[in-house]
Swiss-Prot record:
Keyword Acetylation belongs to the record: no
Gene: prpC2
Alphabetized InterPro entries for the sequence: 2-MeCitrate/Citrate_synth_II, Citrate_synth-like_lrg_a-sub, Citrate_synth-like_sm_a-sub, Citrate_synthase, Citrate_synthase_AS, Citrate_synthase_bac-typ, Citrate_synthase_sf
CDD domains referenced in this protein's UniProt entry, alphabetically: DsCS_like
Protein purpose: Involved in the catabolism of short chain fatty acids (SCFA) via the tricarboxylic acid (TCA)(acetyl degradation route) and via the 2-methylcitrate cycle I (propionate degradation route). Catalyzes the Claisen condensation of propionyl-CoA and oxaloacetate (OAA) to yield 2-methylcitrate (2-MC) and CoA. Also catalyzes the condensation of oxaloacetate with acetyl-CoA but with a lower specificity.
Catalytic activity: propanoyl-CoA + oxaloacetate + H2O = (2S,3S)-2-methylcitrate + CoA + H(+); oxaloacetate + acetyl-CoA + H2O = citrate + CoA + H(+)
Pfam families: Citrate_synt
The protein's name: 2-methylcitrate synthase 2
């Protein structure tokens, strides 16, 4: 039996400080979040997603020349291996899109002859590849399920605009043709890009700590992000709102869920207790999208659910609550909300993988045994 006492056991590692990181800082006491020292709301209003990606990797915002070189390198990887295209088309259309994303990353690893290289430059090369190709995987998966032709990437466009173009085309009704829609979508990517030692990032760091490869770390992170208690929550939020349908029924739905002790997705956070610092920025984008796309119904439902939850529990929304209806207004299928999260979070995951490799210590916690005491094996005929 271990020497730990019951009070030493922290289920879910709640409150445990597992390591140092310079990538981001979550400050629940002031309801704030910084990436490399910059307030996330400042980055959302003043930077592109690519600038934030660069910042998370290098610790500083890029100069104009550095950003141009970063974009040129990333966009040079916007082509998919023929085998990967064939693999995606061979997968069941009923498969969860997160499983398609995970499978795509695993396949990419099999094609990289230097996959086990752990130096930071190789990790960043893989990050560039994922940044370029995962939006293509997502767009291809959406369109193949609908029986639509695949749209090729455009190397002149940003990550956000290119993704919207590949999913929805470039017609006048496409969000890719509306700069305001592109910008609000880009802001969501910035908000989802990084959040310290969350479950998926910690999973990536655990895998990295064993000196495994970056593709294994990313596939493990995708698996963790798929869960409804982590990234999958934004899908559950929208499924709930679609099921409620009528804003006037939202408060009753919340009260009924609480009466039956059901978990209400989109509310509460393991770290933030006074509200998620990313919500104001995401809510602003959600309201702007609603104003442009006849989404007043979803704003009313959002407000009614939020107010009912606050009145009963005092629990505040997290980022997934406004992000869900925002992605719905853009036109994304609900099951693809979490894969969008993947595309954004690749920035944070790869920054943490580099950080873990550069100052590595195997992550191997202890456990407190609470099973049977030592016993002797009885012959099978006497059991």
């Amino acid at each position: 039996m271990s020497s730990a006492t019951t009070t030493d056991v922290r289920k879910g590692l709640y409150g445990v400080i597992a390591d140092y990181t310079a990538v981001s800082k979550v400050m629940p006491e002031t309801n704030s979040l910084t990436y490399r020292g910059y307030a996330v709301e400042d980055l959302v209003e003043n930077c592109s997603f690519e600038e934030v990606f660069y910042l998370l990797w290098h610790g500083e915002l890029p100069t104009a020349q550095q950003l141009a070189e970063f974009n040129e390198r990333g966009r040079s990887y916007r082509s998919l291996d023929a085998g990967l295209i064939s693999l995606i088309h061979s997968l069941p259309k009923e498969a969860h899109p997160m499983d398609v994303m995970r499978t795509a990353v695993s396949y990419m690893g099999t094609k990289d002859s230097e996959y086990f290289t752990t130096d930071s430059e190789h990790i960043r090369k893989v990050g560039h590849t994922l940044l370029a190709q995962l939006p293509m995987v997502l767009a291809m998966d959406i369109r193949r399920r609908k029986g639509l032709d695949i749209i090729a990437p455009d190397s002149s466009k940003s990550v956000a605009e290119n993704l919207l173009s590949m999913v929805f085309g470039t017609g006048p009704e496409s969000p890719a043709s509306n700069p305001a829609d592109v910008r609000d979508f880009e802001k969501s990517l910035i908000l989802y890009a990084e959040h310290s030692f969350n479950a998926s990032t910690f999973t990536a760091r655990v895998i990295t700590s064993t000196k495994s490869d970056v593709y294994s770390a990313i596939t493990g992170a995708i698996g963790a992000l798929k869960g409804p208690l982590h990234g999958g929550a934004n899908e559950f939020v929208m499924h709930t709102m679609l099921a409620i349908d009528d804003p006037n029924k939202a408060a009753a739905w919340i009260n009924n869920a609480l009466d039956n002790k059901n978990v209400v997705m989109g509310f509460g956070h393991r770290v933030y207790k006074r509200g998620d610092s990313r919500v104001p920025s995401m809510e602003k984008s959600f309201r702007e999208l609603a104003a442009r796309h006849d989404g007043e119904k979803w704003v009313a439902m959002y407000e009614n659910m939020r107010d009912a939850m606050d009145a009963r529990t005092g629990i505040k929304p997290n980022l997934d609550f406004p992000a869900g209806p925002a992605y719905h207004l853009l036109g994304f299928p609900v099951d693809f909300f979490t894969p969008l999260f993947v595309i954004a979070r690749v920035a944070g995951w790869t920054a943490h993988i580099v950080e873990q490799y550069e100052n590595n210590s195997l992550i191997r916690p202890l456990s407190e045994y609470n099973g049977e005491e030592q016993r002797e094996v009885a012959p099978i005929e006497k059991r």
